[in-house]
Amino acid sequence: MKGLRLIATGGALPGRTVTNEELSRTVDTSDEWITTRTGIQTRHYCTEGENAATLAVAAAKQALQRSGLAPADIACCVCATLSAPDATPSVACQVQAALALPENRPALDVNAACSGFLYGTAVARGLLATLGGRYALVIGTEALSRLMDPADRSTCV
């Protein structure tokens, strides 16, 4: 988007790695079938205590550290997710609290599935323009392993 620049990234993965071979023991599929059609060999499932918010906090901490910015520099926090662990507080508000971002700055979630991060970036751009801020924290996080049926081949593969 014109006028925006990415200055740092962060990342976090859930703790459990699930292979195609493991999936083939519970649903009608094979490693070869999955790999040939999707290229996927492993996926990550949340373990106890992990969810979209905990992953967002971990990734955001890493991004903030890499950016060299202080929490006070962040004008807004926008989190793109469709798998928030709770309706309220929003994942963005949980990140805001965990990173000690200023409480008087906007923190909100955007629910737009696969395109969520792009929409979140557009929302952050609008907030920066409106608020006069310089830096936004935009997060994309999902914990779909919490929502899917591990016995349903159409969603677990």
Predicted regions: what is each one?
Residues 1-75, 97-99:
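Conserved "HGTGT" condensation-loop signature of ketosynthase/thiolase-family condensing enzymes
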Residues 75-82:
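Short glycine-rich or small-residue beta-strand-to-loop segments that form or flank ligand, phosphate
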Residues 38-58, 83, 108-115, 153-157:
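Active-site pocket-shaping loop/turn-to-helix segments
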Residues 25, 65-71, 85-157:
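Acyl-thioester C-C bond-transforming condensing/cleaving domain
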Residues 7-9, 80, 139:
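Short hydrophobic segments within beta-strands
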Residues 5, 78, 109:
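Conserved beta-strand segments that form the floor/walls of ligand-binding pockets within enzyme
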